[in-house]
Amino acid sequence: MTTQITYFATAARGFEEMLKTELEQICQAECKVTQGGVHFTTTQRGAYQALLHSRLASRILLPLVTTKIFSDLDLYATIVGINWAYIFDPRDTFFVDFNGTNREIRNTQFGAMRVKDGVVDYFERKGFTRPTVDKDHADIRIHVYLDRENMVVSLDLSGDALHMRGYREDTGKAPLRETLAAAIVLRSGWQKGTPLVDPMCGSGTLLIEAAQMQAGIAPQLHRKHWGFNAWKGHQQAVWKEVLEQAYLQQNEEIQPLFFGFDLDHRVLAKAKQNAKNAGVAHLIQWQQGDIAALKNPCPEQVGTVICNPPYGERLGTTPALIALYSVFGQRLKQQFSGWNASIFSGEPELLNCLRLRSHRQFKAKNGPLDCLQKNYQISERTAAEQQADELKFEQNAQVAPDFANRLAKNIKKIEKWAKQQGINAYRLYDADLPEYNLAVDRYDDHIVVQEYAAPKNIDEQKARQRLLDAVSATLYVTGVETNKLVLKVRQKQKGTNQYEKLANKGDYFYVTEYGAKLWVNLTDYLDTGLFLDHRLTRKMVGQMAKGKTFLNLFAYTGSATIHAALNGAKSTTTVDMSNTYLNWAEQNLELNNLPLRNNRLFQADCLQWLAECRERFELIFVDPPTFSNSKRMEDSWDVQRDHIKLMTQLKRILTTDGTIVFSNNKRGFKMDFEGLAELGLQAENISHKTLPLDFERNPQIHNCWIIRHIEN
């Protein structure tokens, strides 16, 4: 049993050096680090000890053959040439894990199939029973790693991956692998025998791993099935000694200094059961609670706060997360003065919302996500310093103060005006400060923050941080609830991407505008269903529509139709290509108790419908897209290029004393006055009259024209 063999322990990228240190401590192995794991030389007893005690290894492999292959024939020949009868009985089941490709073997499934064929053919040629493949519960797992022409064939002594400790019956929505959780604990700076607090513990994995470390409980102590159980080289007597020694190493006389908090009582119930399964239920105290009310359970001692809070790729929405991290940072400073903290997150910018300065940080992968773990030393503060810090927090002085001040100033001016106007949907901020390139809109008691696409020369991470700071400041200045703040990234519209669905929440509510009720949806689409900058245009159209036949072309959700109908239009006709938005327009009509018999809706290509129209209208409102190349349109559309073609068709259906209200959002749009004159039409630019107070900083957001027949 003193024979030295070189094994290979796999690990998540970034944990190789930690695994090397761990293996040296567990079995005094000679170790060599490589990407993705550690080669370690030890006895078979040492390998058993590593399997039982390693918290960081994903698998432990016994290399059987290391060779070079150049084709699938080489692969097959190598596998057939291994003495498999010396390794396992053909009556046992097996499975092949194949990793890597080269020019000839381009698919891991193909590689695994050729290995399987080689193993089966070996036994059949030797006159043995044909072994069976079992994907889920194999007795033997064969591991093959291929890197270009270099191949290693190994026996997987682990069986199931070593992160599967067996204590987790159920988890929350976004669990950590146990190996990653152990690495986070080891990197946190936590010292055994000191308190460890997880304020957002979820299913409890961080605390359970730490408690097992403190109690000396081997992570695989209760595992029943191993990859070596059916291996003919397995030494049961040695394994039994290693197992018995592990039981003797447990330390039952330790203080219960582990504390887990979570808002969700159902997740806490799972955490309690997991802790019981892991043998550490008596060491961990669990409590349901909100992070905003977090209190230090051991104020007389110094310990560590460890946490894997939610982040954008996992749970929650950005505004709620910004508020969560901001409050968390404040509670750390208020309640854990003199303690250490270690926070793991998939969004480094969110860690900045803690407003703490880290002294160490580590990169790691959580599945496909690039994550960061930051360690902090929370400075001790006097009562006066804590009070001053709380005042700063209340004033939000540390987060985007210039933006916060401008937003507060705008709110004071605009909300008074909006109340006088009888509207509850309006813009509060529109890129007033160049470093905060975003818009803030109020829709009743909701806030929408729209980030404009940053120029290419702006650092993406810096822009992201400014956005998070601005959202944090908006939450404070407006006082809006986090679940009523919606964040959007708004880019230049191309074609019909304003119609593309972003979500499927179906959260509709209505806003009021000069007596009209209009449905909005802040989450499911790029736009909300209401263009706020056209508010005065809609009001004007409504006033002009009294007693007239009205056509709304490129109608979107029909908001202009609602104003026209409420102001006494003789009839309204609403046309849009999108069935979604036409249904929305119908809902707007129903909301305002406007009957469909006087207010017709047509779902059609607007230009094609116009060409076929034989009716005439006294008032036409047309607000076409700047550009469109929808598959449902016969031709592409460009408002600058094609507006005279549009006017040609509109003139045909316009009564002699009729009016066209023409609007578009193309910056730098130039009206073709000569082309209009040739049609017998004249245009008046009324853009300045249709620009409301909340958009006065952006006079080019739209242009608007009154077009009539030239008087003879």
UniProtKB/Swiss-Prot annotation:
Instruction: Indicate the segments forming the THUMP domain, all copies.
Output: 46-157
- One Pfam entry for this protein is THUMP
The record's listing under SMART domains reads:
THUMP (SM00981)
Tell me a GO cellular component.
cytoplasm
Q: What is its EC number?
A: 2.1.1.173, 2.1.1.264
**Record key words, sorted:** Cytoplasm, Methyltransferase, RNA-binding, rRNA processing, S-adenosyl-L-methionine, Transferase
Single annotated GO MF: RNA binding
Where in or outside the cell it occurs: the entry states: Cytoplasm
Which InterPro entries does the entry mention?
23SrRNA_methyltr_KL, DNA_methylase_N6_adenine_CS, RlmKL-like_Mtase, RlmKL-like_Mtase_CS, RlmL_1st, SAM-dep_methyl-trfase, SAM-dependent_MTases_sf, THUMP_dom
CDD domains documented for this protein = AdoMet_MTases, THUMP_AdoMetMT
Q: Which reaction does it catalyse?
A: guanosine(2445) in 23S rRNA + S-adenosyl-L-methionine = N(2)-methylguanosine(2445) in 23S rRNA + S-adenosyl-L-homocysteine + H(+); guanosine(2069) in 23S rRNA + S-adenosyl-L-methionine = N(2)-methylguanosine(2069) in 23S rRNA + S-adenosyl-L-homocysteine + H(+)
Supply the Gene3D superfamilies for this chain: 3.30.2130.30, RNA methyltransferase domain (HRMD) like, Vaccinia Virus protein VP39
> What broad class of enzyme is this?
transferase
Q: PROSITE patterns of this UniProt entry?
A: THUMP, UPF0020
Q: Does the keyword Cytoplasm apply?
A: yes
Q: Does the keyword RNA-binding apply?
A: yes
| Similarity section | Belongs to the methyltransferase superfamily. RlmKL family.
Q: What does this protein do?
A: Specifically methylates the guanine in position 2445 (m2G2445) and the guanine in position 2069 (m7G2069) of 23S rRNA.
Q: Specify the protein name.
A: Ribosomal RNA large subunit methyltransferase K/L
